[in-house]
């Protein structure tokens, strides 16, 4: 009789990585749509799916433990050169990611931002490719500077960065083509809104 994989090993199974890859593709195809990953631990599952020994990875805030580094076998580098960057969304950005080049805009970094919660909190209105009219995404634990910097980083489209927001078990993608506007009806004094 086959026993189910433990939570720790689930992310490293080929079948789970295929499932997560499809969920990531759906998330990028329909920006702001929240996808729940079976088995939880969205960060581990996303990294196990996207990163391998050919990828460059930065973890400037040391969110990953040593065993994850060893399993991924990714080439660790500074955030400014990395294809994938793991960061705490509640902290302001402390680096300038790679934006790609006009010849190879796909070399722009993908930011994996760990947030407190998707589905409640600050409301963002999204428009752009993959969104029929507007899509609303609510998020808790995303520092406003990420959205401010995102606007600057993506200003020279097709250069820019893509973002994957994740809480414990869910993901939502913000491709560089998506326009994000904070819902000002919920803004409090001193809040800002972003169009990016």
Positions of the model-derived regions?
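Internal, well-folded beta-alpha domain core
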Residues: 54-55, 62-186, 193-196
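N-terminal, charge-rich interaction modules
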Residues: 1-56, 60-66, 70-71, 169, ...
């Amino acid at each position: 009789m086959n026993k189910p994989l433990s939570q720790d090993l689930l992310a490293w199974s080929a079948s789970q990585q295929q499932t997560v890859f499809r969920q990531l593709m759906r998330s990028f195809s329909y920006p702001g749509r929240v996808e729940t990953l079976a088995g939880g631990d969205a960060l581990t599952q996303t990294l196990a799916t996207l990163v391998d020994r050919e990828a460059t990875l930065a973890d400037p805030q040391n969110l990953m433990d040593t065993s994850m580094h060893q399993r991924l076998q990714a080439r660790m580098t500074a955030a400014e050169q990395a294809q994938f960057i793991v960061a705490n969304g509640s902290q302001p950005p402390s680096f300038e990611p790679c934006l790609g080049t006009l010849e190879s805009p796909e070399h722009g970094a993908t930011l994996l931002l760990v947030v407190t919660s998707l589905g409640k909190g600050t409301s963002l209105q999204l428009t752009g490719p993959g969104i029929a009219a507007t899509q609303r995404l609510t998020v808790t634990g995303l520092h406003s500077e990420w959205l401010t910097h995102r606007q600057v980083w993506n200003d020279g489209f097709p250069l820019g960065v893509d973002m994957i927001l994740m809480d414990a078990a869910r993901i939502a993608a913000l491709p560089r083509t998506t326009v994000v506007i904070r819902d000002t009806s919920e803004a409090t004094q001193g809040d800002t809104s972003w169009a990016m």
